[in-house]
């Protein structure tokens, strides 16, 4: 009887672990609105190194190896929501925002602001594989330029 109970208990733990892992990474999970069928995880971190410069570090992880994955566009805004400038990966000098044939991609983008003013960024992530694609939009926190 002890062996049967022990086996049932172990099976229950294994099933719980498998289900927890599957749901934690499940695309279109309401608990993780950043996830979809192509994008598993996104990160945006903002910093103010000095001289009015704002730096935004962006990262995106796909649900597997993607044909194309990265940042399709980044828009810099004043804290009041006024949009200042926007850059896409197809523009000259911004090709590094997109990666190809990989499962994740990271990039850092700088914006020249004015010391003492507060800014934030809106980052548009993109991933595609075959004929399908998905996108996620994220805002950074507001930061004051130094």
Ranges and model annotations:
Residues 2-24:
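Sec-dependent N-terminal signal peptides of Gram-positive bacterial secreted proteins and lipoproteins
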Residues 23-146:
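Mature extracytoplasmic or otherwise solvent-exposed domains
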């Amino acid at each position: 009887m002890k062996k049967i109970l022990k086996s049932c208990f172990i099976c229950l733990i294994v099933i719980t672990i498998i289900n927890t892992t599957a749901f934690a990474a499940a695309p279109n999970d309401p608990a993780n609105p950043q996830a979809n069928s192509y994008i598993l995880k996104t990160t945006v971190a903002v910093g103010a190194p000095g001289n009015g410069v704002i730096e935004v570090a962006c990262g995106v992880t796909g649900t597997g190896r993607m044909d194309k994955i990265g940042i399709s566009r980044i828009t810099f805004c004043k804290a009041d929501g006024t949009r200042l400038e926007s850059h896409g990966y197809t523009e000259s000098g911004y090709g590094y925002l997109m990666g190809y044939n990989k499962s994740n991609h990271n990039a850092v983008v700088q914006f020249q602001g004015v010391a003492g003013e507060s800014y934030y960024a809106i980052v548009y992530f993109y991933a595609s594989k075959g004929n399908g694609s998905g996108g996620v939009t994220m805002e950074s926190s507001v930061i004051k330029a130094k």
